[in-house]
């Protein structure tokens, strides 16, 4: 059987079905939501996770286009196939806008729908025009109206850290969405998608009966590709990639899992893969970083700086209650809600007794992409050279040549210009953590707690554990002596692996040259 073409970049369900492109069947979720209690629904998922395709699937379903669903789950589930009037608003292109631009964007979105419904003399205000659209569609068809709003929060993402501008744009959006509550009797179904969760009072005014399905277990796999969908529905794709990479099926699946899997939006939850990355990987026949290449997380970097969130804070994992990460981003007191809702961390476990979730970076692609995005903020113009150094270090560490790897690092630091705002130990610890975190073949832990204190950096390979202490303005010998005096290595005595202690130091010479040094001993 010939392999179907992947719909990379395509978000229109009707086009995908008409052109017979590859499609993962999510129609059971569409039927479930359309036949549950409630009128208003909201779903938060990271970008490039299939939200737009889900909305256009719903559009075709509510328009009664039964022929598009031949062979899909919903074909057997739905008996009536009633056609409803659908108003579909796409806010995904409403980014990087001032208030006047946003108002013109609303005008364009409304005008498109007004032309469809024959409204020739619309009112001026956006909310009045939306009311008129709903009333006209209801009157012309005699049926309740379906409203689908894609990426409702797109205009706000870039200004989430600018209070004054955020409030201005938020007020305009509140005005636009205000008719949704008052027109309830005329509405069959309202569905909004987005990346972040803004508080209901801030945008949706009196719309206090919206059902947020983002963390509901029945909808855990509504977007993305679950492991079952991959293994049972894409075996030929995995085999083709395995042949290209000269790997076994099992090895290829493990690589896909390591790079693109790891998402969970509730607990328990199936393993969910990033669909854009997975399909792009199959199309290009190459495992690479695709998600970060499709968009720069500028707003995230800005927010990390605003909240003084350090790279090391990501660590191995973090524990939090639901309200700490599934929270409105405009009122957040930590960056955790933005990290979670944007897809940079995800749920890994849940403890019923404490009601605490364990959160962590989902996979290798996100880890590497995130740390590479952070690197320029610590090393300015030397990022490219640092990436080259890291790649060479990784090879040497695999060969258990730690001293040669650190010699490369020493040579690199000699090229880094000194700045006054880097004259403290924390700067070098965070930079070193990013560098070691990008050594993705190894397990890296920063500031690991032991009974005697905290180890600055721990690096674990297949056969060796490196216990590292970092000092600024002191000697590498002093750093090594702290490892000895506080018995940091004792924590790994039962690991069965070789343990190497590494003391590292940074000093600034009179000519402002950065001097990196180290000493190491084996146990």
Regions found by a protein language model. Name each.
Residues 136-141, 435-462:
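Active-site metal-binding core of divalent-cation-utilizing nuclease and nuclease-like domains
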């Amino acid at each position: 059987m010939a392999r179907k073409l992947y719909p990379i970049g395509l978000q229109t369900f009707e086009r995908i079905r008409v052109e017979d492109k590859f499609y993962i069947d999510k129609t059971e979720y569409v039927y479930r939501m359309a036949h549950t209690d409630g009128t208003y629904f909201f779903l938060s998922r990271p970008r490039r996770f299939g939200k737009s395709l889900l909305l256009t699937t719903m559009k075709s379903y509510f328009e009664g286009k039964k022929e598009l669903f031949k062979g899909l789950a919903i074909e057997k589930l739905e008996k009536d196939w009633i056609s409803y009037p659908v108003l579909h608003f796409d806010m995904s292109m409403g980014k990087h806008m001032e208030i006047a631009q946003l108002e013109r964007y609303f005008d364009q979105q409304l005008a498109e729908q007004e032309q469809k419904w024959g409204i020739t003399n619309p009112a001026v205000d956006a909310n009045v025009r939306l009311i008129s659209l709903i009333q006209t569609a209801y009157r012309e068809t005699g049926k309740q109206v379906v409203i689908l709003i894609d990426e409702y929060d797109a205009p706000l993402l870039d200004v989430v850290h600018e209070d004054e501008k955020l409030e201005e744009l938020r007020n305009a959006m509140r005005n636009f969405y205000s008719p949704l509550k008052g027109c309830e009797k005329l509405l069959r179904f309202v569905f909004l998608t987005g990346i972040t969760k803004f508080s209901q009072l801030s945008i949706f005014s009196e719309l206090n009966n919206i059902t947020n399905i983002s963390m509901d277990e029945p909808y855990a796999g509504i977007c993305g590709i679950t492991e079952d969908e991959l293994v049972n529905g894409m075996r030929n794709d995995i085999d083709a990639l395995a042949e290209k990479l000269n790997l076994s099926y099992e090895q290829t699946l493990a690589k896909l899992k390591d790079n693109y899997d790891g998402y969970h939006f509730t607990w328990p939850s199936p393993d969910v893969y990033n669909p854009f990355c997975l399909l792009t990987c199959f199309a290009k026949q190459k495992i690479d970083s695709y998600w970060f290449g499709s968009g720069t997380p500028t707003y995230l970097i800005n927010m990390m700086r605003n909240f003084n969130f350090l790279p090391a804070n990501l660590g191995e994992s973090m524990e939090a209650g639901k309200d700490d990460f599934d929270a409105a981003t405009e009122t957040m007191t930590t960056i955790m809600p933005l990290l979670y809702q944007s897809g940079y961390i995800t749920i890994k476990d849940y403890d019923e007794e404490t009601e605490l979730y364990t959160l962590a970076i989902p996979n290798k692609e996100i880890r590497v992409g995130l740390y590479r995005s952070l690197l320029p903020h610590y090393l300015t113009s030397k990022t490219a050279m640092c990436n080259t150094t890291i790649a060479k270090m990784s090879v040497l560490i695999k060969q258990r040549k730690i001293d040669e790897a650190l010699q490369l690092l020493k040579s690199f630091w000699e090229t880094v210009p000194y700045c006054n705002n880097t004259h403290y130990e924390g700067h070098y610890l965070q930079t070193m953590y990013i560098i070691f975190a990008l050594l993705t073949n190894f397990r890296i832990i920063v500031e690991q707690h032991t009974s005697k204190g905290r180890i600055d950096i721990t690096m674990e390979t297949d056969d060796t554990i490196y216990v590292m202490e970092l000092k600024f303005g002191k000697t590498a010998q002093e750093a090594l002596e702290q490892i000895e005096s506080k018995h940091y290595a004792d924590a790994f005595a039962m690991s069965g692996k070789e343990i190497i202690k590494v003391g590292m130091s940074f000093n600034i010479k009179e000519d402002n040259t950065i001097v990196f040094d180290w000493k190491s001993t084996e146990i």
